[in-house]
UniProtKB/Swiss-Prot annotation:
Its EC number is 2.7.1.211. GO terms for biological process: phosphoenolpyruvate-dependent sugar phosphotransferase system. It catalyses: N(pros)-phospho-L-histidyl-[protein](out) + sucrose = sucrose 6(G)-phosphate(in) + L-histidyl-[protein]. The phosphoenolpyruvate-dependent sugar phosphotransferase system (sugar PTS), a major carbohydrate active transport system, catalyzes the phosphorylation of incoming sugar substrates concomitantly with their translocation across the cell membrane. This system is involved in sucrose transport. This is Sucrose-specific phosphotransferase enzyme IIB component. It is an enzyme of class 2 (transferase). The keyword Transcription regulation does not apply. It comes from the Bacteria. GO terms for molecular function: kinase activity; protein-N(PI)-phosphohistidine-sucrose phosphotransferase system transporter activity. Signal peptide: none annotated.
């Protein structure tokens, strides 16, 4: 799986409009979500 495929899966799981912010380090991606109740 390439980076674009991983990004698409994440966006589909949490909802594109549900992401308020994002941060990353070498091993983790941290997302700030508007509503955690709608996560698939």
């Amino acid at each position: 799986m390439n980076h674009k495929q991983v990004a698409e899966r994440i966006l589909n799981a949490v909802g594109r409009d549900n992401i308020q912010g994002a941060r990353h380090c070498a091993t983790r991606l941290r997302l700030v979500l508007k509503d955690t109740g709608v996560i698939d």
